[in-house]
Amino acid sequence: MSKVNEIIEIVKGLTVLELAELVKAMEEEFGVSAAAPVAAVAAVPAAAAPVVEEEEQTEFDVILKNVGNEKIKVIKVVREITGLGLKEAKELVDGAPNPVKEKVNKEEAETIKKKLEEVGAGIEIK
């Protein structure tokens, strides 16, 4: 079996959290980013006055900052929100701070934050 195939087989066996850790380690090791590249902005004609527009953020990340006193309840809510298995949800909660959901709209982010704060978790929306 080639090295590439061996690596693929190893990656297939990793959990979502392990994959996220792998990506982060590769980004740090090789000095790259796994983020999608942003398309270049078209040049503004010279005659037009520069217009400064701030784009409203449309995608948010919900970060579990701390668990609080109700760890089991937090794990249950994380499982409900993410669809993760018990082991993966526990690893996510134990490893706080961790992202619970990424690239969600503002309404969904606020709903997730409310559910987790109701069981005592500390949440941040980025």
UniProtKB/Swiss-Prot annotation:
PANTHER family: 39S RIBOSOMAL PROTEIN L12 (PTHR45987), LARGE RIBOSOMAL SUBUNIT PROTEIN BL12M (PTHR45987:SF4). CDD domains: Ribosomal_L7_L12 (cd00387). GO terms for molecular function: mRNA binding; structural constituent of ribosome. InterPro entries: Ribosomal_bL12, Ribosomal_bL12_C, Ribosomal_bL12_C/ClpS-like, Ribosomal_bL12_oligo, Ribosomal_bL12_oligo_N_sf. The gene is rplL. Gene3D superfamilies: 3.30.1390.10, Single helix bin. It comes from Desulforudis audaxviator (strain MP104C). This is Large ribosomal subunit protein bL12. The keyword Ribosomal protein applies. Belongs to the bacterial ribosomal protein bL12 family. The keyword Ribonucleoprotein applies. Forms part of the ribosomal stalk which helps the ribosome interact with GTP-bound translation factors. Is thus essential for accurate translation. GO terms for cellular component: cytosolic large ribosomal subunit. NCBIfam families: L12. Keywords: Ribonucleoprotein, Ribosomal protein. Pfam families: Ribosomal_L12 (PF00542), Ribosomal_L12_N (PF16320). Homodimer. Part of the ribosomal stalk of the 50S ribosomal subunit. Forms a multimeric L10(L12)X complex, where L10 forms an elongated spine to which 2 to 4 L12 dimers bind in a sequential fashion. Binds GTP-bound translation factors. Disulfide bonds: none annotated. GO terms for biological process: translation.
